[in-house]
């Protein structure tokens, strides 16, 4: 008997989270004998609990789907909503009743660690309560911090944005003769994957960024001052890339030296300003011209600088999710496995979502070199294939055309 | 008798200042009967006084010239160097001797207000001292604040970057249900042209950015609070675009409420942080989620989001400069005149550089609407043609290929 699909997006936006949505919708449309409609939760599980959803398969035509595939941010809207730990909480019978009413057979949630926690809880409740609804997680995060997957959709485009933008900032910083330090602050609370991507900006060895600091290595202000001085002796224009989440050996975030930290609904520290703190520190210490640049949200939502490899892989993750669910999988996350061999090849597999949720994949400390100021060659081999390929963007009047939820 | 060309770049980088350099070099190469070599000053007039220059026509091949045309920032390097006001200063005989030694007949300086001041002084010294060297200014600034020209090369690409990026930031800001304010701070010390470009981000009337504040209108914190509240009553996600240079009715820069201001060598106030000041103000006032985003240097140095119209016009300005100089012009700046008629057409003319230097073209106050919070339709007609057209970028391994001075 035919069942319906429901799909939601959760957590922070990325450049390709809609490509995964595209993949789920396309795969659903291609299986009319098993799939009725493809519904979308508006604002994730939080919106769905308020009965906010839409029929995507009925609403979107072929052309709109192609635009959706290249639209950044989350078309369905997102949420940061943590499900109750206690599976006997009244929340669960309510949501399962809503799912049954819509004759949902397959539930897909596109997101990161916290979203996989949602998939884990719903699939465990289903198993314990005899529901046949299958729950699959589709990975998504620019932070690239999900375990049991080679990388995550969203990282390749964010890494490409960071590398291209830092290359341009280094060019900009090089136009004057006067000694100057430019500090670029990059996203990544606890994992340095995105900050590491800044080294791809180098066109050759010895290029800026000369110094790169990840959260995985303890940050020491005095050592930093020495590092910057040595770099300035090497060349007049020094570009430094730091993660928003760098902290000292006592675990105090550098940004806390300058600004009070707030906390989001998952208890994450909301970080800003490590770049500003270091800017003031170096200016006061050496009296040189110092500028700090926070790349901010464009890292995750730029649709102008995206990796076509990332878009295609994100779409494939969505398709693979539907295929896995129809084969009977539940409580699984779609993961990427890199095939051995010279050329880059990827396959989609499924991994137990319960082993993935609420875990963080750190940047390998053995890839961090030069006393915590640089990244080793292993990272180039890992990351370069992920940023390749240019999207053929639809433009109108000189601006990108995106799909908006009406 | 054959003479040589020397060309320099001065002031802040733009996405197309190298396209103007390309235009000068190409035009020089096309007139072998009149032009010997095309020299480039390294780091502008400051570097040239240190005998730092290069032979561009001998050094760059056809392929390198095409890459140069699409390379952001300043290939030759730049400077901020103010020539002595007193034309009897020993500086002048020294530099003219250097120019004569190189058999320079034609001097081109690509830059903004301050660079035109350099062209003015050198051309006046030449006239007063019987030198036949001809001095021509090629306009360049993302600020679009040069008078006697329809617009300036560099503005179109910066405006396109701002419009595209604000459109994406608005998309990113719209994914959550919770009320939130995003404040985007844009470049423009005293002229609001670039901040005005943020309204082009709207796909339809009533879209974000809902509020736009330019330096040309007095900024009032209490009125701002009321504007934001009214906007939040309209929709949950409000994007506000402000110029770095907004100031209150007493002329105090809003950023000064929060941070100390520094001064550059031209006496300009170096502004940062109006966005941060307003972020804290609104958060404290209303307790809503507020984020501020400073677009920073990518506005002027992004090569990934550029206007092909801007690139071609910048190259044409360089060519027109050479043509004007060979016809006998000196002490002139190349200016753009928009032809009347339905379709956008531009012609290059020459204007007296002495009337242009050290002047600022403000954004027309009659184009500022809704009590200083929006921009009128005249601006769309003015700006849309300037951001059209996509550059075919040369990419390698997923990253842009640029030309670097060796």
Question: What are the language-model segments listed below?
Answer:
Chain A
Residues 10-12, 41-46, 80-81, 112-113, ...:
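Short, ordered loop/turn segments at secondary-structure junctions
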Residues 4-8, 68-81, 140-150, 177-180, ...:
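Gly-rich Lys/Arg/Thr-decorated short loops/hinges at beta-loop-alpha junctions or inter-strand turns
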Residues 51-105, 114, 153-155, 167:
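Glycine-rich oxoanion-binding loops at beta->alpha junctions
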Residues 98, 106-111, 117-129, 136, ...:
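Accessory alpha-helical/coil subdomains and C-terminal extensions
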